[in-house]
């Protein structure tokens, strides 16, 4: 099985590792236009780890600091990075965009489906409340090439999803399987590369193998993901929404194997209950 991948040519996405030595395995991202003159810095939680990994030219290009949600390991570096960027780029106007004023220094709170333009890049803000009420996924489309990606924070991980800190199973089902998928559109699912907030894939794969697809051959898409993880440390930017629909149990709530894993032998549980029980099962691992 070949995953549905496209190499991003005109837009540039630079993953920046944070908190890998302390177990957080976070990502910040620098999203830049083709000419690299305009950029967004997404979830720069750790200034001492992020700033040294940005060149002087990259710092000059940053128009906005952007948060997927307010948790400190995503927004905690807002003010320090803002200060650093303003000192190094006198007179450059830098916005801080987030889902609520709970993120430090936020100057703009976008509405659901509000759009921004960064050069040829169109950014659609998809509000996906559950992990936090202010969670936003940023869906990017290059209007020149058609290339696409999405920054999902702690809403969607490769082969998993975030905990329901400020929502319910129904909320996460709505966020993942209705709001996000509809906003992107079915014709784009195989084009949209996923950039999550954490590198949790290996743990998610272990959970799925232990609790859902226990046998090789039961889900070939999942088997291929498992093999990829054995030889690759990082999975961010390598998989699409269409890939996730093939193996992510939180996006496969009607799959008999998923329902059996949560005790729904008759296949009668509402989707919200399946989602809630699946999250409990994952939390217990």
UniProtKB/Swiss-Prot annotation:
Q: InterPro entries in the record, alphabetically? A: Clx_II_MBL, HAGH_C, Metallo-B-lactamas, RibonucZ/Hydroxyglut_hydro
Q: Which reaction does it catalyse?
A: an S-(2-hydroxyacyl)glutathione + H2O = a 2-hydroxy carboxylate + glutathione + H(+); (R)-S-lactoylglutathione + H2O = (R)-lactate + glutathione + H(+)
One GO BP annotation here?
Answer: methylglyoxal catabolic process to D-lactate via S-lactoyl-glutathione
EC number in record: 3.1.2.6
Q: Which UniProt keywords apply?
A: Hydrolase, Metal-binding, Mitochondrion, Transit peptide, Zinc
Regulation acting on activity, per entry: Inhibited by various thiol compounds such as glutathione and coenzyme A.
Question: Pfam families given for it?
Answer: HAGH_C, Lactamase_B
Taken from the UniProt entry, a GO cellular component term is:
mitochondrial matrix
Q: How does activity depend on pH?
A: Optimum pH is 6.5-9.
Predominantly, its location class is: mitochondrion
Q: Which SUPFAM superfamilies match?
A: Metallo-hydrolase/oxidoreductase (SSF56281)
Tell me which residues form the transit peptide.
1-10
Residues that coordinate or bind Zn(2+) 2: 73-74, 154, 198
Its pathway is:
Secondary metabolite metabolism; methylglyoxal degradation; (R)-lactate from methylglyoxal: step 2/2
What cofactor is this protein dependent on? Zn(2+)
Which amino acid positions bind Zn(2+) 1, per UniProt?
A: 69, 71, 131, 154
What SMART domains has UniProt attached to this entry? Answer: Lactamase_B
How is the cofactor bound, as the UniProt entry phrases it? Binds 2 Zn(2+) ions per subunit.
Domain of life here? Answer: Eukaryota
Name its cellular compartments: Mitochondrion matrix
Please state which protein family the record places this protein in. Answer: Belongs to the metallo-beta-lactamase superfamily. Glyoxalase II family.
PANTHER family assigned to the protein according to its UniProt record, in alphabetical order:
BETA LACTAMASE DOMAIN, TENZING NORGAY, ISOFORM C
Q: What does this protein do?
A: Thiolesterase that catalyzes the hydrolysis of S-D-lactoylglutathione to form glutathione and D-lactic acid. Involved in the metabolism of methylglyoxal, a toxic compound for yeast proliferation, by converting methylglyoxal to lactate via S-D-lactoylglutathione by sequential enzyme reactions catalyzed by glyoxalase I and glyoxalase II.
Q: What is this protein called?
A: Hydroxyacylglutathione hydrolase, mitochondrial
Organism whose genome encodes this protein: Saccharomyces cerevisiae (strain ATCC 204508 / S288c) (Baker's yeast)
Lineage of producing organism: Eukaryota, Fungi, Dikarya, Ascomycota, Saccharomycotina
Q: Which gene encodes it?
A: GLO4
